[in-house]
């Protein structure tokens, strides 16, 4: 069963390569995937949120979700699962960016993108939240497009990031509610 799922994962990547890669889109996808290197996009957004008193709690939520994503995705699961990158094992898959130095599962880019974007979607005016979700989806897709993740890596990143975002929102609201009761 697991072998079949792994095979399907690879076949989806080859299908994307065959039917959805276009020269004009490739440079855009490379730029989108690089947007999230080291989490920089979401970290910058979080810093901006923390600087404004009106959005500070949203900044706390995003920061907590991003830290959770770093720990769960990049420190724990990548090393625990130790899944080889698809470009190393899927015959015919062409890598469009430089080789990655860590393991494949789950997608850290996707996890951190959804961790922050879901917070923004839940807590900011919808136009900002929707923009954040669109960027997160584009980053997730770019990881497939450039050949560094399997679809299941990206799906796991979406799920983990979303759960961490929801827990972070709940936790910060709970802490803020307790602070108000103490005063």
Label every model-predicted segment.
Residues 1-40, 74-101, 182-183:
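N-terminal transmembrane-helix/juxtamembrane module of multi-pass inner/ER membrane proteins
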Residues 64-78, 129-142:
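Small-polar-interrupted transmembrane alpha-helices in polytopic inner-membrane proteins
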Residues 51, 79-80, 175:
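Helix-loop junctions at the membrane-solvent interface of multi-pass transporters
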Residues 45-71:
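Interfacial segments of alpha-helical transmembrane regions
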Residues 45, 94-183:
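Membrane-embedded catalytic cores of phosphoryl/pyrophosphoryl-handling enzymes
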């Amino acid at each position: 069963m697991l072998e079949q799922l792994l095979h399907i994962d690879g076949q989806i990547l080859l299908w994307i390569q065959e039917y959805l890669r276009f020269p004009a889109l490739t440079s855009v996808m490379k730029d989108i995937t690089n947007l999230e290197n080291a989490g920089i996009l979401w970290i910058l957004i979080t810093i901006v949120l923390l600087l404004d008193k009106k959005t500070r709690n949203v900044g706390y939520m995003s920061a907590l979700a991003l830290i959770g994503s770093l720990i769960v995705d990049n420190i724990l699961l990548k090393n625990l699962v130790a899944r080889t990158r698809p470009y190393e094992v899927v015959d015919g898959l062409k890598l469009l960016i430089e080789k990655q130095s860590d393991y494949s599962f789950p997608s850290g880019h996707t996890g951190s993108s959804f961790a922050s974007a879901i917070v923004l979607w839940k807590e900011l005016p919808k136009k900002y939240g929707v923009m954040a979700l669109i960027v997160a989806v584009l980053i997730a897709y770019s990881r497939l497009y450039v050949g560094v993740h399997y679809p299941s890596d990206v799906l796991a990143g979406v799920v983990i990031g979303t759960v961490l975002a929801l827990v972070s929102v709940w936790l910060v609201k709970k802490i803020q509610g307790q602070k108000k009761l103490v005063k």
